[in-house]
Amino acid sequence: MVSNLLKGLILFSLFISFLNGDDKIFPVTIRDLSPMTNPDFEIKNNNTLVKGIVKSKLNHSDRSPVYCCGDNHAPSNDAYNFVVHNQSTFHSWFHDVPGVNVPVLSKLVFKQNQTDPRVFYYETPSFFPIDDLGFKDPNYKGKKINEPNYMSKDKFAHNYHFCLEMHASFFYIGGEEFNFKGDDDVWVFINDDLVIDLGAPHTAESASVDLDKLGLIKGKSYNFDFFYCERHTTESYIHISTSIDLECKWKDYCGVCEGTGKCCDVSQCTGSLSPCGSWECPPPNIGTKEWKYNCIMKEPNCTLLDTMCTSYECNAISKTCEPRENVDPCAYTNSCEKKVCSEELGGCYEVEKKCYSEAFSDPTCYELPCVNGTCTVNRLCDIPDKCIISTCIEGNGCSHLKKQCSDKDYCTIDSCSSITGECFFDRVKDCQPCNETLCATDESNLCVRTECNPYDNSTCNEIKLVDCDDGNLCTNDICDPATGKCSNLPVVCEIKDACNKPQCDMVTGKCIVTDNCNDNNICSDDSCSLDGTCIHTKKNCDDGNKCTNDFCKVDIGCVHSNITCESSSVCMVASCDSNKGCIESPIVCPSSAFCLVAQCDVGYGGCNQYDKVCIPDDPHCQYGICDNSTKKCTFKDFDPLPFRCQSVAVKAGVIGGAAIAGVVVGGAVALGLALFGAKAGYNHWMSLKNNQMATSSVNPLYEPSPHQGTNPLWEAPPT
């Protein structure tokens, strides 16, 4: 038989073990609202649950829920009413809006469940955390609102109009759960996914999440975001219990756990601002509450937008980059030419010559240069020699024929003055008599005659009466003996296509094709259509490397500049792959110790270090401890050990559903449970006059634990 002393020691041990639990304190942001500032509060509703008010994905950038329906009402179960007006009214639930809400930094204190040390809970049937705060705070300096008192059922005035947000994170180890019961709106996001959706003013509703069913990876960190709104009288009940090991890894400059700097108002930023600059809120990790002195000035670099044909400048009013007005990208170096700019064809190029004349359009005979802004004509066939007769042969250049000076006297030397063009016939001294028989000539040939040699009458000279050589290799020079006239016939070149006329090269005498479609732009590929139309297409500068920007400039040709790959977030490193282009990889954050895990967090603004989580094989029964000195994880049993973790021998010792003395099996354990069977023992204990524990209501023997602890005495074990 157990002695009375032993009974007392057992009872005392159980009582102390229940009361010595640890608390967890979580910072929360509560925004005081009012029906006077937001019509979504005290809105008519039939006290029923409405799902779908928020979208299934959290806005990751500021960790806020996204309203479902834009400028439309939220869905409702009541055809005559709605529960949210629009995205504008919803915005002030979880964002600071001066005059509409008042942010209040507060905290929730979670108690540890003694049945299961992993579980922490928060519960109150009267959840009014900001009574006499917010708009009613004596220190509130904003515009006062004329709000009536809203009374509870027991005729006490409370603040029934507020929204709360709590942010944390956790390393998933397995077996975690989250349970909620309460009113009104509640949304829970894990890893940015909506896992609990209890929308609209309603009576207390329950929801649970088994994290093992969410596809999470053990040892990986995940965000946890909790949103709660009280929007209607006359109750405010909340109960939360969870085995998720939530932690606040950092606080932003607003004092919010894992916040995104929502309290920042760029209109309050202080500093030197350039004419085209604008303020941006600082990253959450600046480590100071003086955010207004740490704002980041953003100024657009408009030169990055410049193209070959357009330059940009910043508009100081709109603070955006705009094209410069009245700026001609094609500055004329020659006022006789017209240029246009084409992004596709590589910049400025000549499209039209102002110096043009139909009479002087043959480029083989004429040039039309622009000199000091004036068009001039250069006649290529004109030479100063008066003894040369020059003409233009269209398409074949210049013909230069010598003036014929002949007196048909073999005793004279015939010449021409290049200055005056006058013929001279100088007599040869001691000219020898001519042997007419020897040097007889054909008088009918007017191109060539045979004359005696004035210096040697035993020989004759063949004299050209007409010199038809015009000095142009692109003509066939022929003298007609009957008439003595020259024919300088152009070389005939075969036509290749409808655009490009062939012509003879005066230097070589050979036919060449002059590219009439050549626009003198190295950034265009020129071709000719069947109908004789010139076609100019953009030159293909693609080098096959996806890490280069390939383009053409009229003064250079193809250019291949390296592209700049920008990362999508502070936690990604951008690089370039010649086959794939820009790619990203996660940034590697260095850790300073074995028991610290370095991770990059976008919300934090970069790398941060957290305590390493050691994952036991059975998280329900053990917890891990990291040792920097040994660089190992060790695991220890929870003390007291939850009933589900007890050995078979201990569990077998539970007689009739009672627990062996000294083993914590529930929040309310009486000594009589060790002496009597489960139900019989409990009934006997309850029948004892005035024998009640203050904690017995927390976890009664025959009711499930509201704090997620397993009650092994819920049913008597089979006999």
Curated annotation (Swiss-Prot):
Domain PA14: 112-260
Keyword entries, A-Z: Glycoprotein, Membrane, Signal, Transmembrane, Transmembrane helix
GO cellular component, one term: membrane
Signal peptide start and end residues: 1-21
Pfam families noted in UniProt: Dicty_CTDC, PA14
Lipid bilayer topology: Single-pass type I membrane protein
Residue intervals on the Cytoplasmic side: 675-719
Membrane-traversing stretches: 654-674
Protein name per UniProt: Protein psiJ
Gene field: psiJ
